[in-house]
């Protein structure tokens, strides 16, 4: 059985002071929760204060992006070595907002995924189709290209520590959600791709999250599906009450 995994993607919200205060409330709210892995992914400036606030808790630290090089003349970038040094465990890579607004390609995302593994970070690798692609009936073709290109050169041993987040782009921040059956269909397809890449044993260990307007009201239906192992939560991760409800609803 794969352990549920709920990760909060805070995007560009919360100052370092706000983030530390929020996390202290969240720790208290989740202190008696077990049977689920939980991570929060604050903006870069908040990583250190959040890391300090999380000490001794049952919540892991994640980042929202990284460069693939250890160091260098890359103004404005943050390296995997820096994230590892802070104590980051997870890193979101390939999010649709990075692809759309910052021109990230499948090839660049692949470099980042391999670098994350090299530095002992666990990628949360995001894939998903746009509304236009869904309406054209090419969801699986789009997701297949993203998965195969994104995971090129990744070993089966590394893939054991991989999380994939299926996030239909048209559902992110819109209030629209793929139906649980639609989400399951794509997540099952992703798992079958992983079987081809790494074999059944490894594919069955990889956790596949759903992302895209996840709320306390829909988490139970989503998590009940056999190939959905958790959620990458956006807006609802910014409030203690809603994020706690999603975490508890996943168990």
Swiss-Prot record:
Matches recorded under Gene3D superfamilies: Aldolase class I (3.20.20.70)
GO cellular component, one term: cytosol
EC assignment: 5.3.1.1
Molecular function terms, GO-annotated: triose-phosphate isomerase activity
Localization (cell): Cytoplasm
SUPFAM superfamilies (alphabetical): Triosephosphate isomerase (TIM)
Pfam family for this entry, one: TIM
Pathway per the UniProt entry: Carbohydrate biosynthesis; gluconeogenesis; Carbohydrate degradation; glycolysis; D-glyceraldehyde 3-phosphate from glycerone phosphate: step 1/1
Protein's GO biological process: gluconeogenesis; glyceraldehyde-3-phosphate biosynthetic process; glycerol catabolic process; glycolytic process
Keyword Cytoplasm: yes
Active site: 95, 167
Keywords for this protein: Cytoplasm, Gluconeogenesis, Glycolysis, Isomerase
Broad class of enzyme this protein falls into: isomerase
Claim: Phosphoprotein is one of the keywords in the record: no
Subunit structure: Homodimer.
Family membership noted in the UniProt record: Belongs to the triosephosphate isomerase family.
Function of the molecule: Involved in the gluconeogenesis. Catalyzes stereospecifically the conversion of dihydroxyacetone phosphate (DHAP) to D-glyceraldehyde-3-phosphate (G3P).
Full protein name: Triosephosphate isomerase
Protein source organism: Carboxydothermus hydrogenoformans (strain ATCC BAA-161 / DSM 6008 / Z-2901)
Gene from which the chain derives: tpiA
């Amino acid at each position: 059985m794969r352990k549920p995994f709920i990760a909060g993607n805070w995007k560009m919200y919360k100052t370092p002071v706000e983030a530390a205060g929020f996390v202290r409330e969240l720790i208290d709210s989740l202190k008696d929760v077990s049977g689920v892995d939980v991570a929060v992914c604050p903006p870069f400036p908040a990583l250190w204060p959040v890391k300090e606030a999380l000490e001794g808790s049952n919540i892991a630290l994640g980042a929202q992006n990284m460069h693939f090089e250890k160091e260098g003349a890359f103004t404005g970038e943050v390296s995997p070595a820096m994230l590892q040094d802070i104590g980051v465990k997870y890193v979101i890579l390939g999010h649709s907002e990075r692809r759309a607004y910052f021109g990230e390609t499948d090839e660049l995302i692949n470099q980042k995924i391999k670098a994350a593994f090299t530095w002992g970070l666990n990628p949360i690798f995001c894939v998903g189709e746009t509304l236009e692609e869904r309406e054209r009936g090419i969801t699986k073709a789009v997701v297949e290209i993203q998965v195969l290109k994104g995971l090129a050169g990744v070993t089966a041993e590394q893939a054991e520590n991989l999380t994939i987040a299926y996030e239909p782009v048209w559902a992110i921040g819109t209030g629209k959600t793929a139906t649980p059956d639609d989400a399951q269909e794509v997540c099952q397809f992703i798992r079958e791709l992983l079987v081809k890449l790494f074999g059944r044993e490894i594919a069955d260990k990889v956790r596949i999250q759903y992302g895209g307007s996840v709320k306390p009201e829909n988490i139970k239906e989503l998590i009940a599906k056999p190939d959905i192992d958790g959620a990458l939560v956006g807006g609802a991760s910014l409030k203690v009450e809603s994020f706690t409800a999603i975490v508890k609803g996943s168990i």
